[in-house]
Amino acid sequence: HYTWSVFHNPNALIALMGGNKAFTAMLDSVFALPPVFDDSYYGQVIHEIREMQIMNMGNYAHGNQPIQHMPYLYNWSGAAWKTQYWVREVMDRLYSAQPDGYCGDEDNGQTSAWYVFSAMGFYPVCPASNEYAIGSPLFAKVKLHLENGKTTVITSNNPQWRYIKALTVNATPNKSHWLTHQTL
């Protein structure tokens, strides 16, 4: 999982892995591999490992907070549709209003923060930057009341659709897969 922990420079990680195609294939493999694990480090099966098996999303273990940004990395490799697919899969399959509708544990609010950001349609892959990676908005309309007194409104034509056809900011087309904090 720590292979993907280059939050500050995904482009360098892509280059180290041989480019966009190889990087995307490596990301794909995380979701495709059988959920096999080695518990020798812990000496027992910890809950994150058991949850990874139950979730049936390959080796992606959403309950392990350091990997939660991983689906958003497809944005950097030219496969944004895969970000949208996997982010929505995680929201739909791993979160619900049931007693067991929350995987993993809540380390300083990270797991719930992932959901809140992702449901709004963006996520801060690198918390130390001013960029948010675009995902797949879950709501038809979200209003953010910012501390500067401004309100940002995010609308989705149909929250049932997980793929983004076009993104506009103040009626101007946005061709990138990121928003800056200043844009919000």
Residue ranges, per PLM feature:
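Active-site core of glycosidic bond-cleaving carbohydrate-active enzymes
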Residues: 1-153, 158, 182-183
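C-terminal beta-sandwich/jelly-roll accessory domains of carbohydrate-active enzymes
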Residues: 157-184
